């Protein structure tokens, strides 16, 4: 979260830039790291915690967490199984005119749908090519919008789709409404769960799509639109 503009897809963007830097030979190793904090996000983009406002069911809870990843040009000899970034699909800003910062899933879902559709077209594959298509923090509402938008374009990812924001919390026990959100949400899910599934062989290949939005405290208070953005990273087990 920056002082002027919040770009909430820093996990996907960081992994993409690190992979391209290493692949181009500009670095042997690059670190991609990102984080988010619940209190900071609430104070800056919603309401101070002391205010005690009631949250709508469409709201998500920003994850307090951080994840860092080392991308290298050489295989780690100490690792029994290697996981690599096979490809990247760079997304674009998509603006559907949503203004509600308490419904970020609706803001970001169109960008995720555009990215996933473009990835499938670029690599000439079907959703079944991936064991999982994993979005960052759409939450329950954003997930439904994503699946509906893709079905309108003849693509059904309902069997492959997973959202970090839905997985990160136990909604029944913690009452997190639509789910989790924030840069740290996708980062810690990738570091703590997704890579583990790949290394253990439960999955062979995933399309990792951290979702994000572009807004500032000024744009939010002026009631401007909240555009969405997403970048896709293909991660596979060798």
Which residues are covered by each model-predicted region?
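Short, small-residue-biased leader/transition segments that mark boundaries at the very start
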Residues: 1-7
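Acidic, glycine-rich active-site loops and adjacent beta-strand->loop/helix elements
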Residues: 8-9, 34-43, 91-92, 210-215
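Active-site-proximal alpha-helical scaffold in enzymes
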Residues: 8-32, 69-74, 181-201
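Flexible, glycine-rich active-site loops centered on histidine and acidic residues
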Residues: 33-62
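Condensing-enzyme catalytic core mediating Claisen C-C bond formation in acyl metabolism
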Residues: 51-117, 122-125, 159-167, 205-211, ...
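A structural signal for small-residue-enriched, beta-sheet-centric alpha/beta enzyme cores
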Residues: 108, 124-127, 134-144
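A short beta-alpha structural unit
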Residues: 131-140, 167, 178-179
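Short glycine/threonine-rich loop-to-helix capping motif typified by GTGT followed
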Residues: 138-153, 218-225
């Amino acid at each position: 979260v920056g002082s002027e503009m919040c770009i909430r897809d820093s996990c996907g963007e960081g992994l993409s830039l690190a992979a391209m830097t290493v692949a181009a030979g500009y670095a042997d190793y690059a670190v991609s790291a990102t984080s988010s904090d619940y209190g900071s996000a609430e104070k800056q983009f919603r309401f101070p915690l002391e205010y005690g406002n009631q949250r709508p069911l469409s709201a998500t809870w920003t994850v307090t967490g951080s994840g860092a990843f080392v991308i290298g040009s050489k295989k780690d000899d100490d690792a029994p199984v290697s996981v690599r970034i096979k490809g990247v699909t760079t997304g674009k800003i998509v603006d559907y005119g949503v203004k509600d910062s308490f419904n970020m899933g609706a803001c970001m879902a169109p960008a995720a749908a555009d990215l996933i559709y473009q990835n499938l077209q670029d690599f000439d594959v079907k959703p079944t090519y991936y064991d999982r298509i994993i979005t960052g923090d759409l939450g329950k509402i954003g997930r439904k919008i994503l699946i509906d938008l893709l079905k309108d374009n003849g693509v059904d990812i309902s069997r492959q789709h997973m959202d970090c924001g839905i997985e990160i919390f136990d909604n029944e026990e913690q009452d997190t409404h639509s789910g989790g959100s924030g840069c740290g949400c996708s980062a810690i899910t990738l570091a703590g769960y997704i890579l583990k599934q790949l290394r253990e062989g439960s999955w062979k290949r995933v399309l990792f799509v951290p979702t994000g939005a572009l807004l500032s405290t000024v744009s939010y208070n002026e009631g401007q639109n909240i555009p969405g953005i997403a970048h896709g990273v293909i991660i596979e087990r060798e």
